[in-house]
């Protein structure tokens, strides 16, 4: 116990080794090809294989593995970085499809990076950028951290530009108080034997590796609020409830994504509130990550006016419906006929 709490203090942890046989030493990433990291693949595959395990000695509510929090990157050794087809990206995609939410670090190569690594280029996982809170509690002055890797991801040529819009979410990752193991300092030495009784929270660190577990904790809260959400639906919940920052970097593809902040700064309260609403209203199954609809304006006098825009990421949208205070679902009116509008083309409703 300590005075410091993360975003999901009651979550359970399952430690899984993904380092190489000799650990993960300094500059190792720059010398070794991604294919060398078979142990990382083995660790991730182990999680997928054991995601439903009944762990001994714990209650049923603690069974299985729900989230992968991955604060590790590997130099891609490819011009322009990974396009998401490397082995690490593919296994993270596999984990998402298997029902395990993946939150992974975007990397710390800054604005002029040479692309994203295999641990940051997955098409399906939640890739996290890092913000700098300027040492204040006011979110209005938060900026993207200078070291945080920018997107987009290298084009994989599949004709769908949406999956290049990485990172997706940003979270605090600068000057973060961290757990620090007592190894050898002053009278404290537990390098060989001993226990963790003298470990502390005396260190501070910065990086997307710190932003990632913050988002992982928010994911845990969302799962607790609505356990019926799939990993891709959870990703949509985070995207739709995040606080937008920056101008759109690819407005022809998505008018909300920014190459620094993704779809915005994570908002735990709004994400949990939306998850609860979807559960209580019975609308969880209605969340489709290929369909986008966003409200633009709301006004109320004698008549309620709601406007927004919508689009499909993979094909046309058939219609947009709305209801007020749980009333009857009604069709919106449109600027154009939705079914005649192709993918990635927003229309007003």
Q: What do the predicted segments below correspond to?
A:
Residues 1-38, 59-66, 97, 121-125, ...:
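Subtilisin-like serine protease catalytic core
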Residues 3-5, 15, 58, 65-69, ...:
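C-terminal subdomain of the subtilisin-like protease fold in secreted/lumenal serine endopeptidases
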Residues 47-82, 105:
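Short acidic, glycine-rich surface-loop motifs adjacent to enzyme active sites
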Residues 73-75, 101, 107-111, 133, ...:
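Catalytic metal-binding/acid-base residues of hydrolase active sites
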Residues 84-102:
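Catalytic-core regions built around general acid/base machinery
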Residues 283-349:
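Long, low-complexity serine/threonine/glycine- and acidic-rich segments characteristic of extracellular
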């Amino acid at each position: 116990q300590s005075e410091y709490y993360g975003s999901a203090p009651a979550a359970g942890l399952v430690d899984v080794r993904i380092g190489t046989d000799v650990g993960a030493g300094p500059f190792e990433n720059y010398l070794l090809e991604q294919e060398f990291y078979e142990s990382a693949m083995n660790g991730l595959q182990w999680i997928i294989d054991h995601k439903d395990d009944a762990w001994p000695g714990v209650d049923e509510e603690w069974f299985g593995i729900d989230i992968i929090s991955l604060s590790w990157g590997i130099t891609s050794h490819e011009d322009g970085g990974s396009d998401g087809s490397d082995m690490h990206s593919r296994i993270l995609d596999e984990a998402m499809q298997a029902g395990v939410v993946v939150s992974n670090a975007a990397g710390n190569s800054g604005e002029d990076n040479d692309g994203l690594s295999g641990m940051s280029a997955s098409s399906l996982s939640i890739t996290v950028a890092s913000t700098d809170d300027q040492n204040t509690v006011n979110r209005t002055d938060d900026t993207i951290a200078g070291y945080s890797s920018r997107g987009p991801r290298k084009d994989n040529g599949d004709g769908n530009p949406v999956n290049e819009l990485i990172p997706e979410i940003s979270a605090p990752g600068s000057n973060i108080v961290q757990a620090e193991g007592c190894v050898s300092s002053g009278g404290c030495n537990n390098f060989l034997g001993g226990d963790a009784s003298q470990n502390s929270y005396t260190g501070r660190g910065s990086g997307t590796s710190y932003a990632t577990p913050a988002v992982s904790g928010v994911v845990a809260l969302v799962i607790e609020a609505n356990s019926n959400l799939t990993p891709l639906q959870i990703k949509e919940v985070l995207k739709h409830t995040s606080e937008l920052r920056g101008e759109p970097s690819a407005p022809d593809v998505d008018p909300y994504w920014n190459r620094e902040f993704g779809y915005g700064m994570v908002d735990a309260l709004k994400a949990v509130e939306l998850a609860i609403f979807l559960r209580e209203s019975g609308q969880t199954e209605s969340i489709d990550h290929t369909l986008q609809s966003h409200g633009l304006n709301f006004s109320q006098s004698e008549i309620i006016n709601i406007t927004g825009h919508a689009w499909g990421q993979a094909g046309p949208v058939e219609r947009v419906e709305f209801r007020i205070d749980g009333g009857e679902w009604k069709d919106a009116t449109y600027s154009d006929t939705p079914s005649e509008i192709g993918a990635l083309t927003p229309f007003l409703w």
